């Protein structure tokens, strides 16, 4: 089962390389069968270098990926100054990278045989819109990506043993023969590490009583935020605003162990583990912000939530309630309209289409209303331009987007950071896939941070909106409990008083 098999022959590699410009990357592919891709990642990773693991369970990409030890890091700091032309430093960093990196894939079918993998903060929005600086900044970067020239990929969903495609993408400068041999060496080394490496994670378990999540505000203060937004709705400033609060707890268990538990507790279409300098992300995101494949664009907005039922019958009743709720239907329609308009900014005229409308997707703790919107990218529009058009997602800001982001900054105490930004990947042959970073633990400064939010409209009930945020947090907190080896009581504390609901 652990035999390494090369599927790229030298002749086809050389033929592809000779037809490409100098500096182009050309993949060399090896294959190996493993019992579990995440175990392979745990064996290949190293405590002293960056790594990523992206897993889909029915998302649009249909593939999972992992990589270790990037050849380049791309980071934009929290205090980045605007570009000379007034543009976004973060998106210009992406543009610059994609301008100098090119892939000629030959017969390789892996969508991302190499690329830039990482995350963008919600605060990239400050580079795109004039948002007041009223929330507290904790210094987290605006953007962190690693350039990985050798990755492991596999098709999702999978059951039982999995064939992993290890793709190494050396640059071809002068000698295609030498590049081919470099590629074989790179692919072989990653495959061998994935099979035979040692698992380096050493969690230091902490008593669950010392790992209780605490809300920055609690139910009463969150209700005040909801009432403040409802006043803005009455005044005509906004139709809908997504408001969140931050939960924190000591980092009692390693992010790798936490993500392993997340995979079992709440598998999600755009799950991710990122281990980057100073910041680790553990994500169980269900939502796609943007998928680009050549000139084809996709976005998949989520708006409308119910908790899962305790029985199949109760689950069906909750779905009927969700689909018939006029508030949820109206909110979903409004946000689909917003996403259509955003995608239309960079799409060919008449190409934007709602391919699926208000389907119901189920997860371990909640169910959602979901739609799928497609478009065709206009000529001479870059992938970074497409990201700018839709970022941040309308479902986690509100409408109208610019004014709503000002309101968010006014009512939320702390900056969102990675929350409601994006995790994903940029390929080197006109493709990208980015989620919306929700249901995500941020491991920073020896603690876990988990932001959860809810969309507020004119008839929102503050207590119900707070409970919805706890429903959304439940799966991640349960995963932390499982990684701790505890049966979670799911209790939350505010700064001043204990609250039922979350641990």
Swiss-Prot record:
Its cofactor is Mg(2+). Mg(2+) binds at residues 331, 468. GO terms for molecular function: anthranilate synthase activity; metal ion binding. It comes from the Archaea. Keywords: Amino-acid biosynthesis, Aromatic amino acid biosynthesis, Lyase, Magnesium, Metal-binding, Plasmid, Tryptophan biosynthesis. Chorismate binds at residues 304-305, 419, 439, 453-455. Transmembrane segments: none annotated. Binds 1 Mg(2+) ion per subunit. Pfam families: Anth_synt_I_N (PF04715), Chorismate_bind (PF00425). L-tryptophan binds at residues 269-271. One of its GO terms (biological process) is L-tryptophan biosynthetic process. Its EC number is 4.1.3.27. The keyword Acetylation does not apply. It catalyses: chorismate + L-glutamine = anthranilate + pyruvate + L-glutamate + H(+). Pathway: Amino-acid biosynthesis; L-tryptophan biosynthesis; L-tryptophan from chorismate: step 1/5. Component I catalyzes the formation of anthranilate using ammonia rather than glutamine, whereas component II provides glutamine amidotransferase activity. Belongs to the anthranilate synthase component I family. Tetramer of two components I and two components II. This is Anthranilate synthase component 1 3. It comes from Haloarcula marismortui (strain ATCC 43049 / DSM 3752 / JCM 8966 / VKM B-1809) (Halobacterium marismortui). The lineage of its organism: Archaea, Methanobacteriati, Methanobacteriota, Stenosarchaea group, Halobacteria. The gene is trpE3.
